[in-house]
Amino acid sequence: MFKPIISSDSHVCEPPDLFIDRIDKKYLDDAPRVVNDPKRGDVYEIKGLKKAIPLSLVSAAGQPPEKLSAKGARFENLHKGGWDTAARLLDQDKDGIYAEVIYPSVGMEICNLADHDYKKACMDAYNLWIAEFCDPAPDRLIGLGQTPIRSIDEAIDDFRKIKDLGLKGVMLPGMPAIPNVDYDHVMFDPLWQAAIDLDLPLSFHILTSGEMKGMSFRGSSINSGYAIIRANQDIMSMFVNSGVFMRNPDLKIVCVEADAGWVPHFVYRLDHTYNRHRFRLRGAELDKMPSEYFLENIYLTFQDDIVAFTMMDKMNPARIMWANDFPHSDSTWPWSQDLLQKYVAPLPQKQQDMLLHDNVAELYKLDIAS
């Protein structure tokens, strides 16, 4: 029997009034908004994005593969649980899920905006709304905040504001908004320490690094999907190889929706490259092997990665977390129980507990009765 199941990665569908009602008045005329495109249906228009975001795939959970389309959806026909708290709890019940860690949807694309001041205004508005969304059921809706990282001092202040809103963690953009530096720079160490002191796990979600922009792919467009995971792998290896975890051993990073079955080979490759090539490639001298930092400091989420279910013993089972990704097109909702019975029920009880409940509860300090 499973403990109360916690999805480590679920999403909202930002409602049309979210940004219009909450954004800094300076940006009101340019606030992200829902408009109807005659060919594509309802889409989110955001200043600075060349293409509007179609809402159909944002809320396509439960649709059969042959019905999935980026066109034609109307907001009023989407899963109401994407923005309505009461409806969301019913959606959880339908999938046999007790609680969810909540990420944005439109907010993922906002991470990729070039106008960092506008990005900051959008993220501030989202933080206010997601706190309101989660407030009626804080034990079942685990909200995370956002910040663009325009400066270290501002980001630390944002961390404190996010904590004060009752949110449990922070989703960072794949690239910081500070010019000419990346997260491996030592200037970020005070920010990592602030996250540790505030007990805020930091997440990197796929599609927040601009990895799909300006890229060409061999073969058909289906090949583009694999770059999504590689972008997150690059972030994780950067944290490991640059010594971020060595300098900040209590830092907790979550690699979100990039699957996990690749981890055993990836950590082998980290160690191989470190042993054989670190002098030539100017890698940092680490106190432990790269694999040890990866397996201790990085948490990973996945939905239906069958390899991950079968390779728990080859990873750190205390860092692997299942998710249903509701209401996105990759979601296992409303069939999650069928999936879990097939792949999780055969696992040892301890691994079942860690995968579906314990790891998420420990990471976010959740007090959920078993």
Give the label of every model feature segment.
Residues 2-4, 15-64, 69-71, 75-79, ...:
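Mid-to-C-terminal alpha-helical segments outside catalytic/metal-binding sites
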Residues 8, 38-40, 103-107, 145-150, ...:
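Short, solvent-exposed turn/loop segments enriched in Gly/Ser/Thr/Pro and often Arg
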Residues 10-11, 325-326:
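Active-site metal-binding loops of divalent metal-dependent hydrolases
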Residues 72-80, 90-113, 140-146, 168-172:
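Divalent metal-dependent hydrolysis catalytic cores, especially in the metallo-beta-lactamase
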Residues 111-114, 216-218:
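Short acidic, glycine/proline-rich loop/turn micro-motifs
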Residues 117-133:
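Active-site-proximal gating segment of KS-fold condensing enzymes and close homologs
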Residues 121, 134-142, 147, 152-321, ...:
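Catalytic pocket-lining loop regions of alpha/beta-barrel enzymes
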